[in-house]
Amino acid sequence: MDALNSKEQQEFQKVVEQKQMKDFMRLYSNLVERCFTDCVNDFTTSKLTNKEQTCIMKCSEKFLKHSERVGQRFQEQNAALGQGLGR
């Protein structure tokens, strides 16, 4: 990023932030869709049953832990790749 001037750095940072927000929204949407589909079965009432609430909590925790693990592995791969290129 040293090759970019101040304005270019700001524009680049803005693009990165927009991508991060888009990725976060995609993650959130996938979480909602998956857990709703897997856990909500009773449409006779507007409230969740205790079973549905428990399922949603477990589903969301599992989904977020999985996403965190994937992110960590991605960072590890990037670090390894960066070290390989830095030789």
Curated annotation (Swiss-Prot):
Keyword RNA-binding attributed: no
The chain residues annotated with the modification N-acetylmethionine are 1
User: Which key words are in the record?
Assistant: Acetylation, Chaperone, Disulfide bond, Membrane, Metal-binding, Mitochondrion, Mitochondrion inner membrane, Protein transport, Translocation, Transport, Zinc
Q: Where are the transmembrane segments?
A: none
The effect of residue 67 to C is: Impairs the import of mitochondrial carrier proteins into mitochondria
Substitution effect: residue 60 to P: In tim9-3; impairs the import of mitochondrial carrier proteins into mitochondria
Q: How does it assemble?
A: Heterohexamer; composed of 3 copies of TIM9 and 3 copies of TIM10, named soluble 70 kDa complex. Associates with the TIM12 component of the TIM22 complex, whose core is composed of TIM18, TIM22 and TIM54. Interacts with the transmembrane regions of multi-pass transmembrane proteins in transit.
The name this protein carries in UniProt is Mitochondrial import inner membrane translocase subunit TIM9
The organism's lineage is: Eukaryota, Fungi, Dikarya, Ascomycota, Saccharomycotina
Gene symbol?
TIM9
